[in-house]
């Protein structure tokens, strides 16, 4: 059993992790080499690994040049492995159960939402570009629904109810280098949801269905088939393919236009949707449902970070409403007099 090994229990969990993937982030697989290096912390029995050992090793990763996001992913493999050992009473305390901000500098780049004008410029370019116009509807849907790109990739014909105008999100399509494509549950329990379509999203799905060229043999992945978004070989598109198309579309736009676009990714589309919905005045609980956030705190951070410009705009709106109400009240008093 892994808990009796001379090595860390976390290291022994890697084969199972590679086999099943993780519900949070399959991109963590490249970091398994960090876990298998023979460092002092891994030569200890798991019941002798202290919080100090874990923190020193984490700090050492950043000193070696690992980014905050990468270290966050690595720790995301270790913490649940040690948590399992703690729950099974093989260790008293999880040494990796601490906040990274306690020991690391967050040097990760902030993924801001793009302004509506930037979103429009990007989508207009994609729509009219000979190379990338075939991606337009998928990119449009990402901007207008806030779907995770893995959720979009996993959509099948059965998940789209055009009569009820709903999108059924209950799985996602992932891929790893050694395992290939596979179906996974949504990132969180809250990720399983049914989303209503707006008119423009409904029209986008109409185009997707009309333009989808059914392959001679539908690809079947873990029992799922009829994927909506296919590449030129008739295979289901996955996250990295969407990310590359976004990257290359922005690069092509910036090469052809003096007015440059910022970096735009599928996740920025999601953050943009979330921000726009928060600005529109939607309730936090409703937005939490639409986004599939497991915690209301994640959703509330969007409201907290809207910024001074948005705060000023909201104050101005309230002031304008106040003036209108005062004028209406004055008019009523005048008529009564």
Regions found by a protein language model. Give the residues of each.
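N-terminal core-binding DNA-recognition domain of tyrosine site-specific recombinases/integrases
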Residues: 1-90, 108, 130-133, 235-241, ...
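Proline-centered turn/helix-capping motifs that create local helix->coil transitions or kinks
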Residues: 3, 85-95, 162-165, 171, ...
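Basic, Lys/Arg- and aromatic-enriched nucleic-acid-binding interface segment
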Residues: 72-76, 87, 91-155, 163, ...
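Short, polar N-cap/turn motifs at the start of nucleic acid-interacting alpha helices
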Residues: 159-166, 282-304
């Amino acid at each position: 059993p892994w808990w009796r090994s001379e090595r860390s229990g976390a290291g022994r969990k890697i084969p199972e992790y590679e086999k099943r993937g993780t519900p949070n982030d399959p991109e963590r697989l490249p970091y398994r080499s960090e876990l298998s290096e023979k460092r002092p912390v891994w030569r200890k029995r798991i019941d002798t690994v202290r919080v100090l050992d874990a923190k020193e090793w984490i700090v050492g990763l950043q000193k070696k040049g690992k980014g905050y996001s990468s270290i966050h992913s690595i720790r995301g493999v270790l913490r649940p492995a040690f948590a399992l050992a703690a729950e099974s009473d093989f260790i008293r305390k999880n040494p990796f159960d601490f906040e990274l901000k306690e020991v690391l500098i967050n040097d990760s780049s902030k993924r801001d939402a793009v302004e509506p004008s930037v979103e429009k410029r990007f989508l207009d370019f994609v729509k009219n570009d000979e190379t990338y116009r075939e991606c337009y509807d998928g990119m449009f849907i990402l901007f207008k629904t806030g779907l995770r790109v893995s959720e979009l990739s996993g959509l099948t014909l059965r998940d789209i109810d055009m009569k009820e105008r709903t999108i059924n999100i209950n799985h996602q399509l992932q891929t790893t280098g050694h395992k290939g494509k596979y179906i996974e549950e949504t990132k969180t329990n809250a990720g399983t949801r049914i989303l209503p379509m707006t008119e423009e999203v409904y029209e986008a799905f109409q185009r997707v269905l009309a333009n989808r060229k059914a392959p001679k043999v539908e690809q079947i992945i873990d029992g799922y088939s009829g994927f909506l978004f296919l590449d030129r070989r008739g295979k289901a598109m996955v996250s990295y393919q969407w990310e590359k198309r976004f990257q290359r579309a922005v690069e092509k736009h910036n090469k052809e236009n003096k007015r440059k676009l910022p970096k735009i990714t599928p996740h920025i589309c999601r953050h943009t949707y979330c921000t726009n919905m928060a600005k529109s005045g939607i309730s936090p609980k409703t937005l939490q449902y639409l986004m599939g956030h497991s915690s209301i705190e994640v959703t509330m951070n969007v409201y907290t970070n809207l910024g001074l410009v948005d705060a000023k705009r909201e104050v101005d709106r309230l002031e304008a409403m106040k003036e209108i109400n005062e004028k209406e009240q004055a008019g009523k008093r005048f008529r009564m007099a």
